[in-house]
C-alpha cells in the first residue's frame, strides 16, 4: 500500500508484486522489467545476478538496510547497481529491542500466559531493576545510537563496542567487546551481518557473559550461533 501511495507522484513507473522471494528459481520472472525490489529473505548470489543480468536487469533495490544477502562484488562486475534503505525508523527498532528486554526482565510474557489461564500467582514473576545496571550496545549506528539513548533514559550505564565511534554519544564509554560481554547486564546487538560478525555470539562469548544476562538481537539472526544460544539457555546463563 505504501508503494502504491508513492506511485501517485511517479506516473512513469509501474510496479508488479510477487509473493515469492527472489532466488534462483524465481529470478527468471524478471524478464521484461527494468529493476527488481527484494527484501532480507531473498538470495541474490552470483547465479541469481547472472539470470537478472541476462534478463536486462541493471538495478537491484533492497527495501532494507542490510545487504548481506547480495553478492555486491558480482553485481559490480556485471554492472548492476545495488541500492538500499540506509536507515528507516531507527527509533522503532530500538524501542522494540527495549520492549523485548523489558518483557524478559519483568517476565511480562510469563505473567500474560498465567493471567490468561486464570492463574494469579506471583511465583516466578519477580524481575530486576534496570536502573543502575550496565547496558552493552554492540553497534552504534542509527539504531544502536537510539538504543543507547533509551538505556540512558532508564538510568543505565551505557558502554558500547563499534569499530567506528559515534561522536554524538558523549555519554557512552566505548570498550573492547570482551569487556562489554563480561560487564553488561543487558546486551543488545545492532551490527550488520558480515564475515566478522557471523556467529559473533557463540559458546565462547556466551561463557564470558554474566549469569542472568539479558541478550537481545534485532539484527540478523546469524550473528548469534543458535546451538550455542540453546546451550546457554539450558545452562541457565540467561
Question: Whereabouts are the PLM-identified features?
Answer:
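An N-terminal-biased, well-structured beta-alpha scaffold segment characteristic
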Residues: 1-81, 202
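Glycine-rich Rossmann-fold phosphate-binding loop(s) that bind the pyrophosphate
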Residues: 140-141
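Phosphate-binding beta-alpha-beta segment of Rossmann-like dinucleotide-binding domains, i.e.
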Residues: 78-134, 146-149, 153, 161
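Hydrophobic Val/Ile/Leu positions in short beta-strands of Rossmann-like dinucleotide-binding domains
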Residues: 38, 135-137
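Conserved beta-strand positions in the Rossmann-like core of class I SAM-dependent methyltransferases
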Residues: 16, 159, 222
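Gly/Ala-rich phosphate-binding loop of Rossmann-like dinucleotide-binding domains
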Residues: 53, 148, 152, 233
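Rossmann-like adenosine-cofactor binding region
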Residues: 163-238
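A short helix->loop->beta-strand "cap" motif at the edges of active sites that frequently abuts
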Residues: 54-59, 78-80, 156, 211-213, ...
Amino acid at each position: 500500500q505504501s508503494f502504491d501511495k508513492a506511485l501517485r507522484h511517479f506516473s512513469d513507473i509501474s510496479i508488479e508484486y510477487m509473493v515469492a522471494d527472489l532466488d534462483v528459481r524465481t529470478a527468471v520472472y524478471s524478464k521484461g522489467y527494468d529493476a527488481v525490489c527484494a527484501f532480507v529473505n531473498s538470495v541474490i548470489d552470483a547465479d541469481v545476478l547472472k539470470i537478472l543480468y541476462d534478463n536486462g536487469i541493471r538495478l537491484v533495490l533492497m527495501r532494507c538496510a542490510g545487504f548481506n544477502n547480495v553478492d555486491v562484488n558480482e553485481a559490480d562486475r556485471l554492472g548492476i547497481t545495488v541500492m538500499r534503505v540506509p536507515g528507516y525508523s531507527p527509533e522503532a527498532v530500538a524501542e522494540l529491542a527495549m520492549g523485548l528486554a523489558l518483557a524478559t526482565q519483568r517476565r511480562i510474557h510469563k505473567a500474560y500466559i498465567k493471567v490468561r489461564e486464570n492463574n494469579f500467582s506471583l511465583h516466578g514473576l519477580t524481575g530486576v531493576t534496570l536502573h543502575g545496571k550496565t547496558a552493552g550496545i554492540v553497534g552504534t549506528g542509527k539504531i544502536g545510537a537510539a538504543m543507547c539513548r533509551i538505556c540512558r533514559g532508564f538510568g543505565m550505564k551505557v558502554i558500547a563496542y563499534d569499530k567506528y565511534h559515534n561522536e554524538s554519544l558523549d555519554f557512552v564509554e566505548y570498550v573492547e567487546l570482551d569487556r562489554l560481554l563480561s560487564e553488561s547486564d543487558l546486551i543488545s546487538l545492532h551490527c550488520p551481518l558480515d564475515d566478522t560478525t557471523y556467529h559473533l555470539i557463540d559458546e565462547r562469548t556466551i561463557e564470558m557473559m554474566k549469569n542472568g544476562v539479558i541478550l537481545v538481537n534485532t539484527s540478523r539472526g546469524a550473528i548469534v550461533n543458535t546451538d550455542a544460544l540453546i546451550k546457554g539457555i539450558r545452562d541457565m546463563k540467561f
